[in-house]
Amino acid sequence: KGVTRLEKYASCAFAHFMAYGLRLSERQEYEFKPLDWGNLFHKAMEHFAGKAERLDIPVTDITDEMRREMVDACVEESIIDYENTVLYSTKRREYLITRMKRLVDRTVWALLRQQKMGDFRQTGTEVRFEGGVIDRIDTCEDENQVYVKVTDYKTGSKSFDITSFYYGLQLQLAVYMNAALELERKKHP
């Protein structure tokens, strides 16, 4: 490192002073990474679930127009929460926001459709337990049984694989389901 510093000084004393005296470096430009994409999606879904719970109507009565308006608002709120207004700085990034809105809208549409077609009802969102946070819990009750469904919001295309589960490579959903079952057992002794 010392030799590099000497070489830097020999090539340009001013550059040496800027780098080692003032400790300046090139400004890092913001990049919207896959982790940011996933966090933004997750936050938008969380906002939607909260808004849906506060509605005066059952979520199964949400119209397509209401859903789209809520999704737009939720994505915008999640961008603000994520302190990421830099997303509006280029046309490409604005396009990413449009894509995010479409992805969230498709996901919400599918979840609402599942609720309309079945007997499961959302009973919890962002449910914390000692091993993590379950994005969503739905339950269905009949006279002597409670059925539980957990949803983990993901932006990728990874699906559950029983072989990976068997070898301990894909345990998250099973751990979440076990935690959800324990929580339901406490509610229904």
Regions found by a protein language model. Name each.
Residues 43-129:
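A non-catalytic, helix-rich entry segment at domain boundaries
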Residues 6, 14-15, 119-123, 135, ...:
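Beta-sheet entry/capping signal
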